[in-house]
């Protein structure tokens, strides 16, 4: 149940907030898609941990690139 809540929040972000912003994610898949994959694969605890680590890497001094959920 908790996993579905977090997935719903990410989907809400993708549908209603992300389109209002200019594309800025330096990674593929995007941070929100990465979050969905991490939540599906690992559940809410590890999925949120991986999402937080990924978002913290998303800054101008990191080169970005291909970074799949492992």
UniProtKB/Swiss-Prot annotation:
Q: Which InterPro entries match?
A: Membr_insert_effic_factor_YidD (IPR002696)
Q: What is this protein called?
A: Putative membrane protein insertion efficiency factor
User: Pfam families attached here?
Assistant: YidD
Q: How does it sit in the membrane?
A: Peripheral membrane protein
- Give the protein's function: Could be involved in insertion of integral membrane proteins into the membrane.
What the record says about family reads: Belongs to the UPF0161 family.
Q: Which UniProt keywords apply?
A: Cell inner membrane, Cell membrane, Membrane
User: NCBIfam families in the record, alphabetically?
Assistant: membrane protein insertion efficiency factor YidD
- The protein's organism comes out as Geobacter sp. (strain M21)
Main localisation: membrane
Q: Where in the cell is it found?
A: Cell inner membrane
Cell inner membrane in keyword set: yes
Q: Which domain of life is it from?
A: Bacteria
Cite a GO CC annotation: plasma membrane
